[in-house]
Structures are given as structure tokens and as C-alpha cells.
């Protein structure tokens, strides 16, 4: 059985694709850390209600990348989703 270069490379490509898909299906995804949701362990570590340390945590800015004609990194914070380009120029978030 002789394989031409095209057949051999296509078989290798299919095998690599199958390996990648199977490993992606097996690995667990930590959605809590990915989306900024507190896990059960973090919730138990919070102080008791009425404690001196029971204050709301500081707001952290959410950084995200938008791909269009150019890849740009934005920082979003606030209730209304004000968005600022990371290198200083403001860019209002349009919905």
C-alpha cells in the first residue's frame, strides 16, 4: 500500500484534529474563575454579616478583547458598561 504525500498529510491532519477534540472534551472548564463568579470555597471565606470586615469588595475592571479590523483591548467598569480603550482614549460602549 503506497500513500501519496497528500493522502498521508490528510490522515495526519484528521488524527491531530481528533486528538484535539477529544482532549478538549475531557478537560474540565473552570467557569467560575473564567466569568468572575465566586466559588463555594470563596463564599465560605467571606466575613460574617455585621462584622467590621463585612464590606463590599472593590470593583474590578473587566478587560476584554474585541476582534474587528484591528484587535483592541478594552477595560469595562461601572453599571452602564462604560468602556475605555486600554491605552487611554475613551470609547463609549455601543449596544
From Swiss-Prot:
Keyword Signal in annotation: yes
Domain of life, source organism: Eukaryota
A single Gene Ontology CC term: extracellular region
UniProt keywords, alphabetically: Amidation, Cleavage on pair of basic residues, Neuropeptide, Repeat, Secreted, Signal
Functional summary from the UniProt entry: FMRFamides and FMRFamide-like peptides are neuropeptides. AQTFVRF-amide inhibits the activity of dissected pharyngeal myogenic muscle system.
Protein family per UniProt: Belongs to the FARP (FMRFamide related peptide) family.
Full protein name: FMRFamide-like neuropeptides 16
Amino acid at each position: 500500500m503506497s500513500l501519496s504525500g497528500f493522502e498521508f498529510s490528510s490522515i495526519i491532519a484528521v488524527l491531530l484534529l481528533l486528538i484535539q477534540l477529544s482532549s478538549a472534551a475531557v478537560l474540565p472548564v473552570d467557569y467560575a474563575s473564567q466569568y468572575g463568579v465566586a466559588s463555594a470555597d470563596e463564599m465560605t471565606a467571606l466575613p460574617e454579616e455585621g462584622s467590621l470586615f463585612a464590606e463590599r469588595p472593590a470593583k474590578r475592571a473587566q478587560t476584554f478583547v474585541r476582534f474587528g479590523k484591528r484587535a483592541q483591548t478594552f477595560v469595562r467598569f461601572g453599571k452602564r458598561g462604560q468602556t475605555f480603550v486600554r491605552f487611554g482614549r475613551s470609547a463609549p460602549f455601543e449596544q
